[in-house]
């Protein structure tokens, strides 16, 4: 009976949508024949709610695990740029695919108004090359720049906008970590004169991030590595970007 109770608790906690009948069937698959009332008694004894209440309180970890392959996240960062009339603030938007850590530079503007965000939404959901196309969920904070029209555009493409609670950066940790990386490794180390110089730096960093930078969250692997020699025989070379701000060491082919 102890094994049955352990299994009932496990099935219910790992599968928030499973009701008594579904749990009963899973137990039968393992050779345990029990009545639905037994499952109900066990759940109550262990303080576990019935399926409807359990499903409504699905843990964040369970949600991420269930939809990991189809979740993306988006966020803005700001960068100060010098122009003809002094310093201006540019808003830079990025999107990230959680499973692969691939990042997309979605655009930048000094005025992220509704028209601009709607155009970005069209680009992100484009059925040919939209970064969010075929994603099911998109995590975002409650920034007013993610307008109702923008969220409706995502929803119309089959992507559910998941608006996170205020002051909860840990729930969007993947894109927050990317923002810290691009700031500390690139943007905070440079002074920008005009939008074009910032755009070039962002594109160079994103290329470095994908093809040259190791990622601890991926077992210290590179997301999209370039071909490397199979034997450690060639000379070690350094590829520099942005005048040496970014460096990648590799071997020449022997």
What are these language model-derived features?
Residues 1-254:
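Charged DNA-binding/catalytic regions of mobile-element recombinases
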């Amino acid at each position: 009976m102890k094994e049955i109770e352990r299994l009932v608790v496990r099935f219910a906690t790992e599968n928030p949508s499973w009701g008594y009948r579904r749990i009963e069937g899973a137990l039968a698959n393992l050779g345990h024949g029990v009545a639905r009332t037994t499952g109900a008694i066990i759940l109550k004894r262990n303080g576990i709610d019935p399926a409807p209440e359990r499903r409504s309180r699905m843990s964040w970890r369970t949600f991420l695990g269930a939809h990991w392959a189809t979740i993306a996240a988006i966020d803005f960062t700001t960068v100060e740029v010098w122009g003809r009339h002094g310093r201006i603030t540019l808003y830079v938007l990025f999107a990230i695919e959680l499973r692969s850590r691939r990042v997309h530079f979605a655009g930048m503007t000094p005025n992220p108004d509704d028209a601009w965000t709607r155009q970005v939404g069209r680009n992100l959901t484009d059925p040919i090359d939209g970064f969010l196309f075929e994603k099911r969920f998109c995590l975002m904070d409650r920034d007013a720049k993610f307008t109702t029209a923008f969220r409706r555009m995502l929803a119309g493409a089959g992507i559910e906008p998941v608006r996170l609670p205020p002051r909860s950066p840990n729930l969007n940790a993947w894109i927050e970590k990317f923002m810290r990386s691009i700031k500390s490794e690139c943007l905070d180390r440079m002074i920008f004169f005009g939008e074009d110089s910032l755009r070039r730096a962002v594109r160079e960093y994103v290329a470095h991030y994908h093809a040259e930078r190791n990622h601890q969250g991926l077992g210290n692997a590179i997301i999209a590595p370039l071909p490397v020699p199979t034997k450690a025989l060639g000379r070690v070379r350094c590829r520099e970007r942005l005048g040496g701000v970014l460096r990648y060491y590799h071997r020449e082919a022997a």
